């Protein structure tokens, strides 16, 4: 990062600006420290990979001396931003409160809220329920609603799609007004002059910019980040099982998180390095050269996975998952893995539940590595069956208590690359 580089220059070379209001005016404003915000509705107990770019954007701005505000949508989260299909489930205040506590902890991995830290502009966390709950219906209609054209609101893509299908409730239809009012409140209270968000938030962001102009005569700004997809054009952040990739390690293990990024396609890995990491322009250019010249080494993917796991889960978790990956291929000792890391690594494969008297043939079949005992017998005879990285040559072999990892686990392998796991219980 150049000492003379403006944050907007940084975002531009990284390709992080999708849409924005007057970009030159924003660049001029960011010559001095500004306050910006991004909102996160606590509709779940964890943020997910789809939140990564806005989260990391807040961190980038803070590194350049600007003050980030993270807005927890305690009020808007009870309503829900309209989505393309169907109404959202309504959450209780208690659920929202519990989710906010969990999400605050995740936000701390990205921005520094500490007043006495070395950061010039410590982040602030606010809850829009604190001001929205104080507003009565008359104030809402008079001070907010009168500034919005129904024609403009109906023209929003999501609203149009909902009206053409199953309709939309007035509750969700009002979301845009409440979010716009958040921006007015934050401008008045914190002199906030920039809102950032995902591309799907552009309509809401522009509404807030316009409401500030109408109510305060203020010139504020808005910026959205690019839509992130995988190499096949699918929505970014879906795990191999099809579910979301969560920041909470109890929902998505650090091993699964690491594996998602190390499996990034060559066509997207450089974009991911620009968007998600804090590597310099020169470092990324060097990795881009290696992708072009030696893609089989997958060095860019390894760097990406390491950077992203360290950012979200910490350096110790990164070391553990890299050790697990090495151990599965016999390049490190399986006995050195703690049980949670071993278990999460094996959850990426089939895990068989077997009795203590299971033979190698039982293990190969029950784990799905072979379809029949006849095929399993051939694999053993050809020297292709491994348990805990040890070749098994006896078709009658059963594990001893000493061979069980953490008292119950076995790592099975057929050939060089096909893995499975087994949990051994009492004899059947």
Swiss-Prot record:
GO CC terms in record: cytosol
S4 RNA-binding domain location: 358-415
The species this protein was found in: Corynebacterium jeikeium (strain K411)
NCBIfam families with a match to the protein in the record: tyrS
Annotated motif 'KMSKS' region, positions: 235-239
Record carries keyword RNA-binding: yes
Family: Belongs to the class-I aminoacyl-tRNA synthetase family. TyrS type 1 subfamily.
Lineage: Bacteria, Bacillati, Actinomycetota, Actinomycetes, Mycobacteriales
Enzyme class: ligase
Keywords: Aminoacyl-tRNA synthetase, ATP-binding, Cytoplasm, Ligase, Nucleotide-binding, Protein biosynthesis, RNA-binding
Record-linked InterPro entries: aa-tRNA-synth_Ic, Rossmann-like_a/b/a_fold, S4_RNA-bd_sf, SYY-like_C, Tyr-tRNA-ligase, Tyr-tRNA-ligase_bac-type, Tyr-tRNA-ligase_bac_1
Coiled coil segments of this chain: none
Binding sites annotated in the UniProt record for ATP: 238
Gene Ontology biological process: tyrosyl-tRNA aminoacylation
Protein's recorded name: Tyrosine--tRNA ligase
Reaction it catalyzes: tRNA(Tyr) + L-tyrosine + ATP = L-tyrosyl-tRNA(Tyr) + AMP + diphosphate + H(+)
Binding residue positions for L-tyrosine: 37, 175, 179
EC number, UniProt record: 6.1.1.1
Gene3D superfamilies in UniProt: HUPs, RNA-binding S4 domain, Tyrosyl-Transfer RNA Synthetase
Motif residue range(s): 'HIGH' region: 42-51
Protein localization: Cytoplasm
Biological role: Catalyzes the attachment of tyrosine to tRNA(Tyr) in a two-step reaction: tyrosine is first activated by ATP to form Tyr-AMP and then transferred to the acceptor end of tRNA(Tyr).
Quaternary structure note: Homodimer.
The organism's place on the tree of life at top rank: Bacteria
